[in-house]
Amino acid sequence: YDLDVFGPHSLFQYINRTCTQLGKSLLANWLGTHLENKKEIESRQEAIRELALELNFRQEFRILGLLYKGKAADEDELKAWAKSPSVFRKNIFFRMLPLLAGGINILCIALAIAGIIPLTVFGILWLCFVFASFCFTSKITKMQAVYGKKLQILATYANLLRLIENQPMKSPILKEVREWIGDEKQTASHSIQRLSKLMNELDQRNNAYIYATLNGLFFWEIRKIIQIEGWKEQYASELPRWLTAIAHMDALC
């Protein structure tokens, strides 16, 4: 009897072992628009035969992929987020503010040590900077929440990318997948780890003592959000390739 491609008890249901929404969507696309070129078919078969022998790799890939319960909109949301304009980094006032505040504080401390001005002047300026930082708290908190959600997705993907980076590849398709995620000097997983580090540093603003001290010295949270926006600008063009690499590896596994 005929076997349906999609739906209950379908071909897709029987062969689908993907662990990400990216891989599931790609596998469905492959079944819906099958290859007709002989060389392309043989090339994909070669990649599948190679992965069939790598049981540990496939099992670890699946386990890591299932740690995050993704949704169908993840890919579009990540790409839209990567293309979204920077709020603080594009504004010269915000870029200069941490430098100006830091410079003024250093100057005041130096003058106070030299006995030219009383130390209370530094204390008053520091308090002014702390209160001024409250003007940006709401906007930065909203951005922190958005970036945190994206990082949750990217952190899972970083583990999958690291597996791909460390796995020896022989077939042309698998080698191409490796090329999509960077070279030894700058890997995709390392780049995402850098974002994770920046986000962890920004999370220190939840500590009231650190928040007041560092913002009073050089508007620390603005400096951090500018660095995070810089990361997004630097890797926005790379993100679609990373997602494509994960999707292909997941569908092939």
PLM regions and their residue ranges:
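Alpha-helical bundle segments enriched in helix-capping/polar residues
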Residues: Y1-C253
